[in-house]
């Protein structure tokens, strides 16, 4: 069962406690059967815009990954450094140098190269927050050099050749940094996203990066959290823009007139810093705020994402508590989510056994 099936399940489960809240904050929130169906349709359609999102961006699981993971290319450069070190050592021995001292220096240098590579490889995974010291080490490693003797502008696509032509070709052989942010790594937009227009008819308020993609190696490896660059995150976030355009141009019947608003609110935040319209909680319907909680919980607990490990119930609720505290999701609906036991009902139906751990909901309440 994929997210398109799981999100409707959570949203439907979460909606009922709000409907049944006779004396609390949601006592005036009542649902007809048409309302329930409207939410159901909206939850099925909430990510329909992803049909135009490149799959390799959605599934990007390492920092250097594009269509393939460029860590393999980077690893070969480290191998070249090791071969060069061995060749330099042998040349020095042949020239009459102290063999024992040179061999000891070689052993130390090879160990240093190995350590640098494994640091870069670990950084590529993006599992931990990358602090300033780690970013500085990436740059230091990148400044090491290797010699390229072959022309890198042959055997490539027309588009890539055009990007290379922005800069003069160096004379070969050329000494280059081990890791680079090159001009040809910057890929411009063919057409500027219409959502960037402040006068767009949909009310989108988005910040558009200067480039469509930035494939710089140091730039990507220096991502602070996760594996996505700002450019890639914009492309992924654009799915909700496309969802809104699709749904708002459908001739929906009156009973489904709020489907676009409900479906397209799951990336908005209560404090108005969300996407794509920067709506505040007061500007969102209860159903749209329910969708936001459903989408977050499904994403955190999903076991079928290639770019992240699945989280347990307790891990997921802890993250959601931080989001509620920061006014990124509706605090009252989040508490209702806990008190009603929706999280547990969903877990029993959809989560793997090793994800369902003991949960004390009092630990995850937000004052």
Please give the residue ranges for each predicted region:
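Histidine- and acidic-residue-rich, metal-dependent catalytic cores
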Residues: 1-367
């Amino acid at each position: 069962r994929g997210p398109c099936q799981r999100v409707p399940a959570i949203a439907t489960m979460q909606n009922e406690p709000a409907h049944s809240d006779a004396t609390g904050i949601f006592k005036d929130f009542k649902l007809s059967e048409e309302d329930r169906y409207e939410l159901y349709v909206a939850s099925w359609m909430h990510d329909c815009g992803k049909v135009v999102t490149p799959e390799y961006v959605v599934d990007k699981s390492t920092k250097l990954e594009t269509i393939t993971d460029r860590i393999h290319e980077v690893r070969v450069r480290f191998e070249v450094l090791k071969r060069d070190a061995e060749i330099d050592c042998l040349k020095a021995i042949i020239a009459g140098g102290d063999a024992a001292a040179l061999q000891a220096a070689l052993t130390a240098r090879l160990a240093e190269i190995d350590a640098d590579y494994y640091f870069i490889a670990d950084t590529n995974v993006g599992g931990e927050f990358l602090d300033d010291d780690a970013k500085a080490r990436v740059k230091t490693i990148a400044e090491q050099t290797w010699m390229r003797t072959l022309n890198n502008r042959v055997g490539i696509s027309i588009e890539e050749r055009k990007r290379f032509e922005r800069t003069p070709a160096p004379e070969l052989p050329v000494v280059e940094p081990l890791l680079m942010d090159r001009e040809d790594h910057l890929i411009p937009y063919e057409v500027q996203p219409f959502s960037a227009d402040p006068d767009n008819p949909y009310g989108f308020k988005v910040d558009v990066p200067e480039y469509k993609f930035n494939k710089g190696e140091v730039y990507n490896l220096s991502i602070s959290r996760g594996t996505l660059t700002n450019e890639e995150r914009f492309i992924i976030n654009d799915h909700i823009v496309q969802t809104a355009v699709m749904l708002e141009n459908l001739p929906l019947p009156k009973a489904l007139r709020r489907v676009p608003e409900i479906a397209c609110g799951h990336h908005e935040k209560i404090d108005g810093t969300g996407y794509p319209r920067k709506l505040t909680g007061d500007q969102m319907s209860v159903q749209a705020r329910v969708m936001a909680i459903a989408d977050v919980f499904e994403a955190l607990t999903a076991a079928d994402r290639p770019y992240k490990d699945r989280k347990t119930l307790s891990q997921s609720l802890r993250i959601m508590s931080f989001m509620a505290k920061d006014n990124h999701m509706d605090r009252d609906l989040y508490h209702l989510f806990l008190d009603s036991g929706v999280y547990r009902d969903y877990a029993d139906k959809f989560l793997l056994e090793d994800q369902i751990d003991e949960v004390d909901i009092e630990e995850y309440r937000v004052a």
